[in-house]
């Protein structure tokens, strides 16, 4: 028996005779898991054998009883070295199992606890009667029984049930006989009753016929019963039950149709006590129509049976009846004109703290008839844009504000300093102990001080004070002071007077002096004694400024660091003496290190410029009053996030003062300085502070309730008095008092969502700091912070009297709302930056290139297209966007990289001519590179110019060049050409950082910002929060409730970030604060770029956003160019070998069986995925135009599956004729004869998935026009299925890049494989890759099997893709070499003849930095030992061992120390 286990047995007083049993001989505690919040302890014991049942029960009962006394729940399990499977022991433990949850459920226990068990063939067999639903119990209860036996110490048992025929017959016989007896008795009783009834009834002359059974009447009665049935709260349902009625809201719905045509709807409902999964089958059309009422957000009454779902294993209601009910929502019942305005409301942009979207907040205020509502998120304004748009739509005023973190710029070390020599001064170092932190609501219980001169204590003061009431346990626990200490203590006023006399002619000193001085002054004021006027030194601020490198400056940490005795921290006499010792250490260091000799110097010479970083934070609400104020607000938010960020955004008071124009200030919540002053310093001090603000905030008593739990306020009466005091402060300071709600969610029942979000922050968050100490300490409850109606607010403040309550709730809030002007948060126009002569330059570059290709004069079709585009581009101010993109592309080209275009920019011929994109949107055409003669095919017969047959120029005989993808300009800038151009560009990932810096270089650092994003809590993350809350707070939720809670907690702001390639450019004739505040991404103050504070989507129509994305294709092309010397621009788009890849593998010299796929698509961008390879196999593309179709089909939504795929399979259409890319719709319809405007509109409706959402009248108009122009019905039907379509220009750019890569795969294979593995491959397994074909194929087979069983990891899935290419490479006759310590590169694969040599980074677990370090170290000299490789190369022992296992190190010794024998030779 271990010592720890013996100690536990002593504590629970386990009987000695039981402890001496053989099972206890080696007893030990394997582990104890302590869940501090839920106060659950989990013991894991080890015993020599399974305990006798009596011993187990004794151990169980004593553990439970002992720990219950300390309010701790206990569970335990046992690991037994030897297991006894005797029938008696098993039967005893079987009976015991039904005393433990969840085996003690009523249905399981009543059916099974009396059955017999035996142990046969390594199984525990339960003999059950044959009529028991074995499948139900086997699936739902036996797993729990297995777990319980494992906890008893039997290990993992297999438990099964068998039907006992003898028992079945016996029970059946008993059942039949007992039932027969009951029937006979019932018949006899009925006869006797009938006789009695007949005796009482008058004779009947004529018998009436028996009524027929009326099914309608029965249905009506059932419906009446359903209407009147008792509603069961969902939380009360724990087992299977029949005819249960719920009422609740639907929050999840899924409709299904089975293969047999039956309809089922699965849905989830909540009544806010819990949630439930429900399902309903439709028996007929009438039942099916009822499905329509089961919609998300609907309130229903349902009746059905509760059963265990065999698939989910959870209780589910099979719904028999359903009815929609009216949900009585809260309403603001005050008359119009008498409704409040909420001035303190948080949205889900308050980081990890509040729930409502700004739209839902504004909608609720508008629905209630409020004329305005304020937005006051914590330290950010990210909800402003959406709030601005929603308020305009809802017709109410949005008041834009925030709850700021205000700090003092320089927190003084000394208060009221005078000219005094610090070395010659006398100090009174004092400390107070109190019953709480509120000077107004708590009491002084000890004042202690040490009078010191030149480091010596010359006199001491120490007095206890009787507060007149018993001390709370919390106070005693914190201070160590008991009621006994206070017996016989002097009255407070006597102690105060004596202490004032003690302090005369001295400098007062305290640690965190603002608290001690505030408490003393409040008590002096209360007893008509003079407040403190002599100088005060705060040793807390002294330490912070003198030792900024220390992380902690509390009294405890400082005394430890300076080895000052502090025997009883939080008793005033000990604290005061320790503070005095520290003071003289500080004075000595200040004199020696900083030359501080005079009291005045402490603040002037020692207080650091950045002392705001350590300053105490106070909340204030700041509101935008006018347009000037909005810009100042943006500046303040920016400064708080950029210059003054320290853990959280901070606004120094002087900075606020400098930008206060157009802003209004409120005193905020209980964390505001005015509220704090009322609590800790008194009304006079609060009045002085209140003069800084524009209004005083008071909140419902329920909001302040946590302060009672924290013992800052005594009780409800104390809260009401604080509110009255705040009103008095407003009266004295001549400031209006506004009742605000501190809204964090909209409805009362949403409180749990915030609870889950806030508690997920852990105990490190201030809001979760525990009350008291020890493992059982809990955080204070969160306040009831829902959005209150005017009536509810008036009720909250009814204690003030009707008139005063109405004034602070309604009149003052309405008046203050009227002081605030409407502002424009989001501008209505686009503001592009200015580049000198941008319009002239774009036009000049366009015509210059056009003349170069097509000659001068230009062909009419080219001239008209350029004129049309330039009219739109120059007329709408878009030239600067084009020119900026051209400059960026040109710079990247000059660095040796191609830039691929994305999106629809390839629809613009001007973009093609100035070099932004390679895609030529003109109709397919020939053009002579020598004489510029051209031929255009404009009848739609050719899909791409690259598919035109080769032919010479008829004028000069030079082979024609071929181009043109037939893409209308309208798909880029809209039909009227006024849509803001969104130019997305794919730069090489290697060159992307340089391209980003180019933007700064072109426009200036102060005008270029990364596009900001806001990261919110995803539903999966919220699910984890809910499960953590269950664990930490001892909750248990059924699956449906977990889903509901996770959905409710999702969407809350968690962090900020940046778009991977988006750069926002502010016009150089404005500044960023005209559009948005700025910040660092994810609060990373070391980031090289600042981001927009607003999500970039919120301002993307006001400023230029450049999408400078990183992509592998340009990097791959650059690598192939470096390896081959081939200019990728010269690679033909119609190379026969490349096109052959799409129809077979012969061009690669392998069979489909060798590489496992019928085509050569492996590793080709756009076409190498399993999905697209399948499309290629079905469609057999042979032209560039068909490849464009495939690209469009594979990227669209509902374009291929269930649409084009079926049309092709059924022979209705071909790959060429189906709808593939969005632009094809407009082109096809115009060729069919529709007007361009209508063709464009139809394309827009279809590509956005709106075809079935527009009105039937509008849709029929389009259909009639198409049919009039002989557009086939299948084409029209196909339009109706599409949800999203890919731009043809995007497809063309991607396909062109893909064909260039494919060219190298066909004609320069070893270079292709080198580039692929260097750039695209995501996972490596070098041992397999260098092990030959058999090893590669065996590993692929292994992963294939895992995939079928859903067991493959993400790494294995990535590895499979890599191995497919390795296999193909090996089958083509190339080799994969081993990692070479002296030849391998750090990052890139190397070509050695027909062999690839892998780089160091391909070794699993070896990162880029170590790879580069190894290469650098080997250049300095050979590695003589493994130790040297670890030391110089930076490789870990694990990596060196792995290299050794792969025979990379040869015979390298462990170390390079020579033996004594070696020295002689």
Swiss-Prot record:
The keyword Cytoplasm applies. It is found in: Cytoplasm. SMART domains: EXOIII, POLIIIAc. Residues 427-583 form the Exonuclease domain. It holds the Pfam family HHH_6. GO terms for cellular component: cytoplasm. GO terms for molecular function: 3'-5' exonuclease activity; DNA binding; DNA-directed DNA polymerase activity. Its EC number is 2.7.7.7. GO terms for biological process: DNA-templated DNA replication. It is an enzyme of class 2 (transferase). It catalyses: DNA(n) + a 2'-deoxyribonucleoside 5'-triphosphate = DNA(n+1) + diphosphate. Keywords: Cytoplasm, DNA replication, DNA-directed DNA polymerase, Exonuclease, Hydrolase, Nuclease, Nucleotidyltransferase, Transferase. InterPro entries: DNA_pol3_alpha_NTPase_dom (IPR011708), DNA_pol3_finger (IPR040982), DNA_PolC-like_N_II (IPR024754), DNA_PolC-type_N_I (IPR028112), DnaE2/DnaE/PolC (IPR004805), DNAPol_HHH (IPR029460), DnaQ (IPR006054), Exonuclease_RNaseT/DNA_pol3 (IPR013520). Required for replicative DNA synthesis. This DNA polymerase also exhibits 3' to 5' exonuclease activity. Belongs to the DNA polymerase type-C family. PolC subfamily. This is DNA polymerase III PolC-type. The lineage of its organism: Bacteria, Bacillati, Bacillota, Bacilli, Lactobacillales.
